Amino acid sequence: MSVWGKVLGASAGFALGGPLGALVGAAAGHYIAKFRANALSSEGSDNASFAGENSQEARQVVFATALVVLSAKLAKADGVVSREEVVKFKTIFNIPKSEISSVGAIFDKAKETADGFEPYAEQVAQLFQSTPAVLENLVGALFEIAKSDGWVHEAELRYLRNVSRIFGLDSGTFARISSQYAPEDGEPDPHSVLGVSSDTPDQQLKARYRELVVQHHPDKLIANGMPPEFVQKANEKLALINSSYDKICAQRNIK
């Protein structure tokens, strides 16, 4: 079963708590915000709670659910939900036809207003606080939704910046993400992609590159809770990191 078939939780034996669980329950016509003893989150938290042996799968369900909700909130941020944004959402996230209606119910419920996205962002931020690369990929996916109608509107950019802040990503990381997904003049600047400057010493450049490759390797992201359905996007991001490093090395004649 794809991760999209698990977002409602009950059929897979999951119990999704907190704001995400409440919204999913409302969309499904019932609430499934129950808690289990072996929680992924800290005791007393409102985050999603699953059996310990399902921790990786549980994180994947939370990731996918949060992405549906935050994408819907983003689509409404500029005041209008365009057809391009809805189509782009279905395309980027490879939602099977059999799951479109159930995922669509959550999307529709979440887009009723652009207000109130913070609790959902806070819930997923707490769960993935030790794996910021997963959160970075989530923000990147939101950027793709934002630019699906040709450009990123100012209201959408504010929304993305606020989500990134709640995720605990600093301004430098947000600038690096935005340079990858919303370049002003075509190709992303390789220095911006790596988060370095033109005068960064070669050894620091190499260290930074290696750090990013480790953080954003698809296998590691999946192990940390990114659903396998997103591996193509992860591969594209890793390829961009590699090509950016190669371009800088060519400019500097680094062998």
Protein language model regions, located:
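Small-residue-enriched hydrophobic alpha-helices in membranes
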Residues: 1-76, 80-255
